[in-house]
Amino acid sequence: MKPALKIAIAGLGTVGAGVIQLLDRQAELLAVRAGRRIIVSAVSARDRRRDRGVDLSAARWYEDAAAMAADPEIDVVVELIGGSEGVAPAVIEAALAHKKHVVTANKALMAEHGTRLAARAEE
């Protein structure tokens, strides 16, 4: 089996916590389908003390989501912050600058910056 795919999640609201829960619950099936384990190795959110109902003990915590996206140990950055300005585009820019794969469902960000970010991803 290949080395684990290390995921960083920026934004731990309802969707972010749900993604972590789903990845944990479906870990065996995902590992078989992907040919390697998929682990959440880093997270970032505004409030570290908030109880999100998921176990984050195995993940490194980052106060700065863009710094997390630049971490050389991370393979994929999942942006779940939302909004088209501020932190969300900075996280994606940092991830792309460090040749990371990026996952987002942020329609506002993609509508405003999608063309530029797609070009950046192709560099």
What are these regions (language model features)?
Residues M1-A97:
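N-terminal glycine-/serine-/threonine-rich beta1-alpha1-beta2 phosphate-ribose binding loop
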Residues G83-H98, A105-E123:
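Rossmann-fold NAD(P)-binding glycine/threonine-rich loop
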Residues V77, V102-V103:
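Hydrophobic residues within beta-strands of alpha/beta enzymes
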